[in-house]
Amino acid sequence: MFTIDYNSYRTLEPYGKRVRFLVLHYTAVDFAGSVKSLTTGAASAHYLIPDPTDPSYRAAGFKGQKIFSLVAEEDRAWHAGVSQWAGRSGLNDTSIGIEIVNQATDVGGVFTFPDYQTSQIRALKQLARNILQRYPDMTPKNVVGHSDIAVGRKSDPGPKLPWKELAEAGIGAWYDEAVKGKYLQQFSDEMPERAQVIQAFSRYGYGVETPASDVFFRALVRAFQLHFRPENYDGVLDVETCAILYALNEKYA
């Protein structure tokens, strides 16, 4: 039996942590259903943030806001599925997933997005800041929604997640209003060509099709709007959406 010496020498660089993305989700079911699907089903996530007003949460004997750890961060959770971001695919291997209990619905493509509880957002801020402190590769652009990395397939965490508020708390990306205004003025005269816009989406991190079908392009625009222009996520590339995209690339890309 040979002894492994863990102490005499340690590599300082080059090496990096496996985890570089933080992916936010909603569960689309109540607490009881969320726990069942995430602990006994095919899906899993590292953390679950319940809704303390959920009757099934209280029925389970809990009260007040909690955060549940379901999978150790060093282990892979099955939350991202078929996914792409920043030139990488299959993000289960390189991400931490946070599921938030929120009973959003999709009935034949018609969505309802309930508000998140204030305590859930406070819990998310606490948890996300703690995670970000430990993973330096989680840059603002690498804090994403499931809809960002699974364009056309997923809509979570939906337009009710306060991404701007999170960014102001140091979690994720947001654009500068002044830079957005600059591009609003520029694009009010002439919008970029569609191929240029697709390139801009790719530059920011989105997985794109080249050439992009009309269906995919609309889904791509909608995914972006769900995150950065939640007041209107109709999938139509208008001047404001384009200005926000270019403002983000100027700030982060």
Where are these regions (language model features)?
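C-terminal extensions
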Residues: 251-253
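Active-site-adjacent loop/helix surface patches within enzyme catalytic domains
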Residues: 1-137, 141
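Generic detector of bulky aromatic hydrophobic side chains
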Residues: 54, 60-61, 71, 147, ...
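Basic/polar, cationic surfaces and motifs that engage anionic cell-wall
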Residues: 109-212, 219-233, 239-247
